[in-house]
């Protein structure tokens, strides 16, 4: 059993019969007519699926025996992929997430509607995290509000509380990932020290660090580097 499946089982163990959880990875935000800001997937979605692409959704529904575990992804469009890059295929999504039931994202709303209509749904969990009162609603918050309007008799619960508590205690896979990240960071800092000399600029040392960690397999830095 892969770590994402183990985490989903822990979530399902906490859902009462008649409860469901819906998580969205989010959507990219356009920065211009032909470009978008760098996409950051919802962390809870990634925690339960291992996937970081936009326009995906996960439905966990303890409304049936056995419980529903369904992943929704974007349908590949070859002409678009020339400009946006390859999309995850159904087989790839199954392999990464360990979820057997993978469908295309345009069917997620109808699935939720059928689940509500045909099964006993008393409460629905969405990621309703808000850092401050003035914050713009996240994509998941927007979906939660829309769900509440469409199904006012179903209680809305915050998945953020449950999932944040789970993520505070690292499992074996997370510990191994952290140890690898620490080792890569160490090598990056050693390169910074080895190349440091009078006259070098901060942005040059930033480039040395990021080159080293990327050459060792890091996808990116965890936080933006503060360098002048």
Task: Describe every region a protein language model picked out.
Residues 17-33, 179, 183-228:
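Active-site cores enriched in adjacent His and Asp/Glu residues with nearby glycine-rich loops
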Residues 1-187:
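A composition/biophysics-driven feature that prefers long, compositionally simple stretches
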């Amino acid at each position: 059993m892969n770590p994402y499946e183990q985490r989903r089982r822990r979530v399902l163990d906490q859902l009462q019969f008649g409860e469901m959880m819906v998580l969205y990875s989010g959507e990219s935000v356009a920065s211009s007519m032909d470009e978008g800001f760098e996409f950051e997937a919802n962390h809870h979605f990634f925690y339960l699926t291992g996937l970081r692409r936009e326009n995906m959704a996960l439905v966990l529904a303890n409304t049936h025996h056995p419980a529903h575990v369904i992943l929704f992804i974007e349908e590949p469009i070859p002409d678009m992929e020339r400009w946006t890059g390859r999309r995850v295929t159904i087989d790839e999504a199954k392999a990464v997430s360990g979820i057997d039931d993978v469908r295309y994202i345009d069917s997620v709303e109808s699935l939720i509607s059928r689940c509500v209509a045909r099964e006993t749904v008393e409460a629905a969990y969405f990621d309703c995290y808000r850092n401050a009162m003035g914050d713009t609603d996240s994509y998941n918050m927007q979906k939660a509000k829309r769900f509440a309007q469409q199904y006012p008799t179903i209680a809305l619960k915050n998945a953020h509380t449950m999932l944040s508590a789970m993520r505070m205690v690292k499992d074996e896979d997370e510990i191994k990932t952290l140890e690898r990240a620490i080792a890569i960071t160490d090598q990056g800092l050693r390169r910074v020290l080895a190349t440091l000399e009078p006259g070098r600029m901060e942005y040059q040392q930033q480039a040395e660090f990021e080159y080293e960690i990327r050459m060792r397999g890091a996808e990116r830095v965890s936080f933006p580097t503060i360098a002048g």
